[in-house]
Amino acid sequence: MKNWWLLFIVFVSCSKNAQVYAPVGGLSEEEMGVSKNRAKQLNTMEREQIQEWISKQKEKFYPTQLNYWSNIENLEQRKKKQDGEQVSFQYELYDFDLQKFYEKPKIYKNAPLGKFEELDAIEDAVRYLNPDEETTLLVPSVLAYGTYGDGDQIPYDMPLIIKLKLIK
């Protein structure tokens, strides 16, 4: 019986609490909090800048539930296309000085809704557009390419103007 207790004590005393590390390349809890706070402040600042930009335009823009603006009033009250429906559309990206990022529009043919690898604001707006209808979207960077940019011409933390057209 003494041997069992002795063995038990040896095993228990040898086991150490495993240290918990943040994932390689990951952020600690404190860093996550700082990052979250930065994103929140950036989003608030960009929303204010976009609203100021809107106030200087002749065209009206309307906020959406997804946190972007469209020049179509009551866009989200229209009939919504469902996941799986195929749509064809094109869009062009601009900064708020109306400088175009790419010469040619990005064109997608027969893209199934719900499986987009595009910006969330584009997929959301496409769901409500009618064939051959166009809209202009004002999108904060958090809904655009965020803190990384697109890896090509769009820098990080860049709010975008998106001119979107549903082809069919």
Predicted regions and their residues:
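Sec-dependent bacterial lipoprotein signal peptides
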Residues: M1-C14
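Cross-family detector of peptidyl-prolyl cis-trans isomerase
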Residues: C14-K168
